């Protein structure tokens, strides 16, 4: 019985939020669709008192903007906390100035991105990598997952 595996059916947002929660001490959030769900999970788990891998409840700070969330991540990292955030499309573009600072100072963090098309004349909400590709020059290492399992791993 000790070798019994536990399987969970979930979507990519839950998988990314679960891992982010386990490995973070602080989450700076600002809701932007389709990544809002990840931040909502983390906020809910913190409110319930769920502990991360370090035996602590993750501190969640909801900011006034995407740029504010990135700035809070930067400040938290400089203070030594393992910090994460969640974003998508235009929100990620607003984080680029802080991403340069974070990468330049070699501070360890993860930005969980729900890749989505950027707003244009067509206002597409479909999956796309324009947002992520706009950040490739910041100095961040980028990993992408092709499935929910890869997001969890």
Q: Which residues does each predicted region cover?
A:
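Structural signature of the thiamine diphosphate
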Residues: 145-153
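Thiamine diphosphate
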Residues: 1-134, 139
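Short aromatic/hydrophobic contact patches that present stacked aromatics
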Residues: 142
